[in-house]
C-alpha cells in the first residue's frame, strides 16, 4: 500500500520546508485535504487491496466476467420498499427484495421505486477532481504573491548569521520596504489574499453540495445520520435494525442488477442477479471522514476569513500590535516597538507583507527588522548594524 502513496511523501516533505505565504487554515485546504483526497482516489483504484469492485452471482449461460462488467457499467439498484422490511424475515438484506423485476407491460415495480447506484465507478474521479478544486485557491494566491516572500526572506530565516551579513540584509530589506511603501507596490496583496480565502470558503460549500448531488441527495445529512444511528445502536441495539443503517442506504454492500438478453424464442428476457460491492466498504468510510472534515474545514475557513478581514483589512496595525516587542538600546534605555509605525507610515499592503515576513524570518532577525523600520527615515547599513548589535 505504501508504494502507491509514495509520490505523496515527497510532496509533504517538500511542503514542510517551503516558504509560508499563508496561514494554517489555508494550508489545510491545499496540503492536508488535497493529499487525503488523492490518497483515497489512488487506494480506490488499487484492486489488490479490496478485490474486484463488484461480484455478481452467476446466471446460467452468462459468463461471470460478462455479468460483472455489465452490472458495473450499467449500475445496480436497491428496492425502496425493501428498506422498510425486516431483515431475516421479509428480506435477506437491506434494500434487496424478491420478485421486484419490472415487467414489460408495466406490472411490478416501476423505476421510481428503485434507487440506482451508478456513482461507484466515478468515485475515484470525483475525489481527484475535488483535490484539484481544493488546490486552485492556493495556485491563484501563489501566482498573485509571485515569490515575493521568498525573495525578501534572504538568509534571515537562519538562526545563525554573521553580523555583517545580517546588517547588510536588514539594510536591503528595510530599504526595499520603505521604497515599496512610497510606490504602493503591496496595495493589492491583502485584497488578493482575502479573495483566495473567500474562495476556500465557497469551495468547501460547493464541494459538499456537489457530492450531495452525486450521491443522490444523501450526503449533506450523512455524517449526522451515522452519528445518530451509532448512538441509537449503542443505547438499544435490538431497536435499530440494520435496514436503517444510513451507511448502507448511501453505500450498499449488496444490491441487485437487471440483465437483458435475447431468449431462445427471440424475445427479450430480463434476469435479476444479486451483486456484492466490496469497494463500498471503503467508500462509506472515506465519505464519512470527508463529511466531518468538510464541516470542520468550513468552520475554520470562515473564522480565518473573519480574522484576515479584521487584522489585514480593517485594522492593519492590529496584527503586529498583537506581538509587542520590548527592546533595549544601551544600558537602561527602554524602547517599545509596538507596530505603531505601521499605522502612521505603512499601509495595509505593507503591514500584510510584514506579517508574511514574520512567518518566515527568525524571531530575533524579525525583532531587529522592526527596530530598523521604527525610524521614519531609511536605515543605512551602518545604522542597522548600530541598532541591532
List PLM regions with ranges:
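Membrane-embedded alpha-helical segments and the immediately adjacent membrane-proximal loops
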Residues: 1-389
Amino acid at each position: 500500500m505504501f508504494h502507491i502513496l509514495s509520490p505523496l511523501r515527497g510532496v509533504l516533505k517538500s511542503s514542510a520546508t517551503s516558504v509560508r505565504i499563508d496561514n494554517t487554515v489555508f494550508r489545510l485546504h491545499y496540503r492536508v485535504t488535497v493529499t487525503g483526497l488523492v490518497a483515497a482516489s489512488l487506494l480506490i483504484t488499487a484492486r489488490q487491496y479490496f478485490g474486484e469492485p463488484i461480484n455478481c452471482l452467476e446466471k446460467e449461460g452468462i459468463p461471470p466476467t460478462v455479468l460483472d462488467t455489465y452490472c458495473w457499467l450499467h449500475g445496480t439498484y436497491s428496492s425502496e420498499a425493501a428498506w422498510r422490511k425486516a431483515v431475516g424475515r421479509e428480506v435477506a438484506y437491506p434494500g434487496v427484495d424478491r420478485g421486484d423485476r419490472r415487467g414489460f407491460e408495466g406490472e411490478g415495480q416501476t423505476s421510481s421505486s428503485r434507487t440506482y447506484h451508478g456513482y461507484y465507478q466515478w468515485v475515484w474521479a470525483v475525489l481527484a477532481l475535488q483535490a484539484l478544486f481544493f488546490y486552485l485557491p492556493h495556485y491563484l494566491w501563489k501566482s498573485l504573491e509571485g515569490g515575493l516572500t521568498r525573495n525578501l526572506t534572504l538568509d534571515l530565516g537562519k538562526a545563525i548569521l554573521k553580523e555583517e551579513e545580517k546588517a547588510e540584509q536588514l539594510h536591503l530589506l528595510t530599504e526595499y520596504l520603505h521604497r515599496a511603501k512610497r510606490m504602493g507596490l503591496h496595495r493589492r496583496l491583502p485584497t488578493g489574499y482575502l479573495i483566495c480565502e473567500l474562495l476556500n470558503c465557497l469551495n468547501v460549500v460547493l464541494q459538499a453540495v456537489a457530492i450531495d448531488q452525486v450521491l443522490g441527495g444523501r450526503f449533506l445529512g450523512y455524517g449526522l445520520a451515522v452519528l445518530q444511528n451509532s448512538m441509537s445502536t449503542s443505547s438499544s441495539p435490538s431497536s435499530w435494525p440494520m435496514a436503517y443503517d444510513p451507511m448502507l442506504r448511501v453505500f450498499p454492500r449488496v444490491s441487485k442488477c437487471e440483465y437483458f438478453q435475447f431468449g431462445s424464442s427471440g424475445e427479450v428476457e430480463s434476469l435479476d442477479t444479486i451483486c456484492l460491492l466490496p469497494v463500498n466498504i471503503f467508500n462509506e468510510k472515506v465519505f464519512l471522514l470527508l463529511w466531518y472534515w468538510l464541516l470542520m474545514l468550513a468552520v475554520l475557513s470562515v473564522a480565518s476569513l473573519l480574522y484576515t478581514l479584521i487584522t489585514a483589512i480593517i485594522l492593519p496595525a492590529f496584527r503586529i500590535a498583537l506581538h509587542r516587542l520590548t527592546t533595549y538600546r544601551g544600558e537602561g534605555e527602554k524602547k517599545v516597538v509596538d507596530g505603531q509605525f505601521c499605522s502612521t507610515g505603512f499601509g495595509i499592503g505593507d503591514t500584510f507583507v510584514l506579517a508574511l515576513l514574520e512567518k518566515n524570518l527568525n524571531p530575533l532577525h524579525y525583532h531587529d527588522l522592526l527596530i530598523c523600520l521604527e525610524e521614519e527615515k531609511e536605515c543605512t547599513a551602518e545604522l542597522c548594524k548600530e541598532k541591532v548589535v
